[in-house]
């Protein structure tokens, strides 16, 4: 018990209480903003192996509960993740999963193929699963996603008749908007069977069969198809590629992008390279890795991509 308290004393951003069955401890100075209630002690060895997994799984089992302001509790611990203990060698299978085609398809399927109805419960009508773009303070999530796609399409400088590839096309809203507004010919690729089926349904529903196609395909198979596109876009998919495959991903883009073409890459980024959080990798995004901007720019140079524009949408993602 005391060892656990000593471990938790490293997290000092907010004052909080730690409660056990027969005892209570005050950590930090000032009035506590929340209480961590341990109904069952967590072995110190588990906290040292992975603080994230130990606390997260204890909460899932009901061995740990948060009383008071849950947002502040999450902000408190997640904002100090640099103080978490992570034994990367002991968590190798979680932290550094295989980036083979077979394994990445399995990881994508485990996240996206749990049913479109589930995603419809909390995504907006566009089924966009990435950062919105808020032009006005009172923009709804739907309007922010429409804004985002419109903004992306403008950055791509599309013209009627152009060909556009969307790598990781999701449920297809971006390509549908591009076809309707610019009369481009678009191709979307995804590894998710659920997204593939829904996108196909939407294409038929919108009468866009002459403009759009969607394929179940790994980006690594693109060069084999000998496709060539005027424009390539990828929104929120790079996080699934894996650090070992960033260069390969960009190589594949370079091979299918026509000379003088434009490539727009939208991704969640970190300031520095980091293997990621064990709990998130195990339960939310298997195989997911957040790249840094600097490493992606470095890889882009190897394929002679000239960076024309960089924009940070962090505040928009926070609101999304």
Predicted regions and their residues:
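Conserved class I S-adenosyl-L-methionine
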Residues: 160-168
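A short acidic, Gly/Pro-enriched loop at the edge of an enzyme's catalytic core
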Residues: 220-232
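Substrate-binding/catalytic lobe of Class I Rossmann-like enzymes that use SAM or dcSAM, i.e.
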Residues: 268-320
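Feature captures hydrophobic
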Residues: 1-145, 151, 155
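Conserved SAM-binding strand-loop segment of SAM-dependent methyltransferases
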Residues: 206-220
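A short glycine-rich, Lys/Arg-flanked "PGG" loop and its adjoining helix->strand segment in the class I
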Residues: 247-259
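Conserved SAM-binding loop of SAM-dependent methyltransferases across substrates and taxa
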Residues: 171-182
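Conserved beta-strand signature within the Rossmann-like core of class I S-adenosyl-L-methionine
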Residues: 260-268
């Amino acid at each position: 018990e005391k060892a656990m308290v000593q471990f938790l004393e490293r997290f000092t951003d907010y004052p909080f209480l730690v409660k056990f069955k027969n005892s209570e401890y005050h950590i930090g100075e000032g009035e506590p903003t929340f209480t961590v209630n341990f109904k069952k002690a967590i072995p110190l060895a588990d906290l040292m192996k992975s603080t994230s997994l130990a606390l997260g799984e204890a909460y899932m089992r009901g061995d740990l509960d948060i009383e008071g302001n849950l947002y502040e509790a999450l902000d408190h611990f997640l904002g100090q993740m640099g103080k978490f203990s992570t034994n990367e060698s002991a968590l190798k299978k979680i932290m550094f999963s295989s980036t083979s085609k077979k394994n990445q398809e399995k990881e994508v399927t485990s996240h996206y193929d749990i049913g479109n109805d589930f995603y419809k419960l909390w995504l907006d009508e566009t089924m966009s699963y990435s950062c919105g773009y808020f032009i006005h303070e009172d923009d709804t999530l739907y309007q922010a996603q429409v804004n985002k796609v419109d903004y992306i399409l403008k950055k791509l400088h599309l013209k009627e008749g152009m060909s556009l590839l969307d790598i990781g096309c999701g449920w297809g809203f971006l390509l549908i908007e591009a076809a309707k507004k610019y009369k481009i010919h678009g191709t979307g690729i995804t590894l998710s069977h659920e997204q593939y089926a829904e996108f196909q349904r939407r294409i038929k529903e919108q009468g866009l069969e002459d403009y759009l196609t969607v394929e179940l395909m790994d980006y690594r198979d693109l060069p084999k198809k000998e496709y060539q596109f005027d424009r390539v876009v990828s929104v929120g998919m790079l996080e699934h590629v894996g650090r070992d495959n960033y260069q390969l991903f960009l190589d594949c883009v370079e091979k299918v992008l026509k000379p003088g073409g434009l490539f727009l890459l939208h991704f969640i980024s970190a300031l520095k390279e980091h293997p990621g959080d064990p709990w998130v990798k195990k339960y939310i995004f298997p195989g997911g890795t957040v790249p840094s901007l600097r490493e992606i720019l470095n890889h882009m140079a190897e394929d002679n991509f000239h960076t024309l524009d960089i924009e940070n949408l962090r505040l928009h993602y926070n609101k999304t």
